[in-house]
């Protein structure tokens, strides 16, 4: 097959220049895809595929109009594709095309998207366990980098930033645990040379200045390599994109609460266990009016701060806004629909901001004095809210607003108005005046021709094929003057042109072209001016987002009757009338208290299934996190410590789907908690050891409790069905028991009240009944449970014996579990039989005659004696297990 030529050949040549998955090449008024790209795009976006011939071969072709490209590209990027865009431009020889930008999941800039879009790089150290990490959000200009100690820490950071695109370094591309856990990110293999530390360090200093690396402590080679690779990748995606990145920050300033992926999932901060966004903490408190505000609220909830000053500053602002309803509502009204200024600044720096984007920037800048006026003469005029509004340089913001106000038309979408305001550019004003005069001449031409030549049904119009023309109705078509030249005959009319009309048309086209050229040049100048102010606009964007977020938290606090928490200085945690923030929004909720301090730091929570243990523990964790996010909390009163991390162990649904056993996942999560938690952490354990044998489970839970109590000393809430663990409160000074109360006078009623002390029952059979387990099964379970409690023998009912009974045979034989003997023995449904009577007689005959009885083994006798003397309540399960194992070995050896 011959190589394609023409447009197809040019497309194939450009495609070889890029590592992007797809190429969109401009061909006039359309962007076209050819070959496999066309088939892929048509399949993903439901486009029609046609064929393009080249050198005797046919190639699939699909296209989208130039004006509609961006939404199509965003749709492809959301599906994980990287899309290169080749624009067309004029040359002396005709048309030429070159790739101007590459849009990938980590570099797409959509002002309407509320979520952060981080691009990440992961570099594994060659001489250690550490990793270098870098995260950049090109939509807002945020850039952070640093080193972490190991794969676990790297995974935690990846889950914290949740990147949409990941660049693994040369040593992190195969079977790397950190990269493997970035499940939702598109993995892009960037060129290896971009990770070279020397080149990366040079690139970073050029971008951020000589001292930037030292200022953030970016001295580890792996971290430098990761940051440099991100910057290099962003540079390859489009000219000017990196201009929005004006600051390099540390990966972790050390003031964020540690929340690993397991905890975020278990607490359902932004996504439920089922993967939904409704029913989460974020969806409950998100009353924001802007995309930037929603994004900031998400950041505060998923990465709360440990900085007491910052927490109190947010609490002060929320308190002020909650108490000033009218002013708060006015602020939210003004903010409603405000554009994402930081992202618009990023679009300006990469040259993609259009007139509408620039007008949106102007509108946002114009909001600043309106917002200030809204709080003037109110309780908000002096205090934390006023401080937030004062963050941007007001003089610089006003100056930029005035420039944009004088430069841009009120409505750039109005085709008759243009995009540049009258009076901004003298030459453009002259061109517009001449153009309007020419258009006026054309508009009046039909009336003039009617009067001059006595014609009826005369119109003047224009299309792409014929240009400007005079259309005369059929009844007057034969009466037109001689200088009319006919160009087309229609069913009821004819079209004509004249020399004068053709001259006017050329003048109009020249003026239109000149107007478009001047407006394009002026828009570019305005865009460059906005790009120069990127840092100012990022500050304005943060200000509007913060004000929106604080107002949203205040709105929810006022609506849900939340209270301001007090920060304790002695690590005391006291909640009165605490509630679950999500559950209380959908159903009537029973509030509960919680008290923990240095003398009461470990609570063992017992109670029936479905009684509310898990909800109680989660609500406690969420109350602490809400406080450190800067929010009020769902309680009557709350005094809370500042924690450095929240760790949870609840379930293993995701990992089970990946083929990892429940118990293995449980132990890995427990291991992470035991290694990571500190005395300033909050730990929530909802069952430990349930994925293995009972004794093993109790032993692990017991040992973990001792370790958390004695070594870690973290505040811990531990829900368990192992009632043996409740005895730890008698041996470990800071362990206390609480339980969820149940009333069982007439059936079982879950009271949802948490009270001091342990519970003695789990009511599992009742829960089975509530779940719809068949009645016979529930009844039999009750019967078995009663016998177990009375330490009576349990008869195991069989099916085959029942068939024999129906045939007229003897009573069915049953297997009976003798609790005292610890084994199954033969028995019958009725509890007696002839064989049984004979056996009893034989036993009676032998009673008292032990001449043939075997002698009791001395070692066995010693074991029995020791067993009788052992106080099982005075030793731990681990010690008891060890002793039982020793007894078994002694009997086996005797």
Regions found by a protein language model. Give the residues of each.
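Basic, polar low-complexity surface loops/patches
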Residues: 1-278, 283-292, 310, 314-317
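Amphipathic heptad-repeat alpha-helical coiled-coil/stalk segments that mediate oligomerization
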Residues: 258, 269-274, 287-289, 363-437, ...
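ATPase nucleotide-binding head domains, primarily ABC-like/P-loop NTPase cores
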Residues: 2, 35-38, 498, 550, ...
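C-terminal tails and terminal domains of large nucleic-acid-associated
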Residues: 863-894
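Long, charged, glycine-rich C-terminal linkers/tails
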Residues: 88, 241-252, 448-461, 554-577
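Coiled-coil termination/hinge junctions
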Residues: 437-463, 540-543, 550
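Short, charged/polar, low-complexity loop and linker segments
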Residues: 139, 145, 313-323, 342-347, ...
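A conserved P-loop NTPase coupling/switch region
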Residues: 30-31, 35-45, 50-51, 167-211, ...
